[in-house]
């Protein structure tokens, strides 16, 4: 699907290969598909999809020790982020003004938590749309209705389903999809990808 050799960073090359191997393993585990049973192609906006007796979209993300995959019969985006200290200089440069204000009202662990919730939701949305970082992160606002995130563009609510994925307390992971679809989410620890299927 990707030209893995094009990545200069050996770690990125390795993780990309592991991620694509994970997709093939899941296609077999979930639907019994062997590699000759399907074609992986790049759709509009550079988003990968599987064409077989059915069509399924998928998306990958990796951070720290985890690679996560989301599958859906409609377009989908997923992002995982290992929590660290909030980078307020990044927020001030890239986030929506309302998000920056919310972050500035917090400190310590609460600020760190919200920063990575924002970041993961935003990344999952950009991966859902396929626009990547060509669309500015400040061009839309994330608001949390309780723990459920919503996305507003020019004060208009986007009709999407955005859900938190409970992967690990040290990570934030969100998936973004059409409201009619509940994606399948599959997290893997990187070392586990070297284990054979049971």
Predicted segment positions?
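Core catalytic alpha/beta fold that binds nucleotide/phospho-ligands
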Residues: 1-198
């Amino acid at each position: 699907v990707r030209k893995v050799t094009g990545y200069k960073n050996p770690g990125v090359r390795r993780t990309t290969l592991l991620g694509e191997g994970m997709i093939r393993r899941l296609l077999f585990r979930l639907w019994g598909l062997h590699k000759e049973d399907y074609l992986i192609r790049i759709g509009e906006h550079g988003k990968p999809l599987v064409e077989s007796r059915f069509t399924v979209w998928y998306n990958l993300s990796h951070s720290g020790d985890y690679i996560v995959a989301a599958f859906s019969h409609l377009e989908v985006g997923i992002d995982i982020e290992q929590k660290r200290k909030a980078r307020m200089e990044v927020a001030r440069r890239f986030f929506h003004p309302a998000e920056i204000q919310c972050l500035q009202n917090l400190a310590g662990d609460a600020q760190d938590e919200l920063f990575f919730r924002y970041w993961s939701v935003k990344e999952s949305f950009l991966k859902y749309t396929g626009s990547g970082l060509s669309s500015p992160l400040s061009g839309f606002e994330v608001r949390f209705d309780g723990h459920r995130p919503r996305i507003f563009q020019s004060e208009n609510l986007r009709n999407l389903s955005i859900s938190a994925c409970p992967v690990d307390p040290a990570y934030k992971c969100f998936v973004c999809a059409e409201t009619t679809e509940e994606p399948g989410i599959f997290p893997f620890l990187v070392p586990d990808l070297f284990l054979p299927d049971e």
